[in-house]
Amino acid sequence: MRRYHKPMLFAGLVSLLLLSGCTNNADDVIQTSIGEVAQAIGDTVKDTASELGDQFKRTGVHKEILLSQEIGSSVSVLKLENEVGNIEVKGTSGDKISVSATIWSLDKSSRDDKYQEMMDNAEITATVSGDQLEINMHPKGDEKLDMWRWAKKEYGFSNFSIDYVVEIPNTLYSFNISSEVGEINLSHLKGRYDVHNEVGSISIEGAHIQGKSNVGSETGNIKVAIDQMDDDSRLEVKTDVGSIHANLAESLQVSLETDSEVGSITGAPRGTSDINGGGPLLSLSTSVGSITIK
């Protein structure tokens, strides 16, 4: 979502509330009601995207492409960027990275043969540069070409998505993951998180946070389940429109910062507080949306 859309959305929501007669205790009403609206928006973004995706995936042309590759001990950073589609990354034992990428046609026209031809000309590479490994799907023979722009130029369409399921060894400890439209799901990863989404939800399970980490979504809910944070680490979680749910391990020691411009905060006071005596910084903030800490 472009930055100028946020104040427009905020103004529209406030106007809607005022027009409906919600003038008593306006501040409380706006905080609560818009927070609920933001939660609904986040849920709707996730549910609608999932339902539409599932609908097309049940009937559309698709192709799965697999990659398994050993990586050296010098590689520590995973980079994966996606325009449209879901990303799932999970930790595993061993010294190989495994990738399953599925291209899905989102077009119900009669061009199935063209979509199949496009998919047959796609491949995945995992390119190592220094300490970074980048996963990329591209047309065969040209790793630098973007799939969507290439398909638009070659076939006249770009109405497809790419879903990634990636398993990585625990020698990788920095995760640069981004998506424009789609869900991001990360599980059981130890390291530094740099995760961003424009439209769609983010879910992180079993996280062990190291270093300075950031997780953000412009439109969509964020769920983080944190098992551990190193003493010198910090984690900032932010969404423009959508809710944040943080599940913290019972023994986790953190210094918590919470802020919501418009929306409720439950499970911790607004502002700063210490959990289990304090520790590394955990910052949770929303522009429009609620925050829940458990």
Map each language-model feature to its residues:
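Solvent-exposed coil/turn segments that connect beta secondary-structure elements
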Residues: 83, 92-94, 102-106, 129, ...
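Short acidic/polar N-terminal linker immediately downstream of export determinants
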Residues: 3-7, 11-15, 22-98, 104-111, ...
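Right-handed parallel beta-helix
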Residues: 65-73, 77, 86, 90, ...
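A generic structural signal for short beta-strands and their flanking turns/coil linkers
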Residues: 95-97, 131, 162, 211, ...
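Short, surface-exposed interaction patches in beta-rich subdomains
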Residues: 205-294
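Solvent-exposed beta-hairpin/edge-strand motifs
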Residues: 104, 119-121, 257
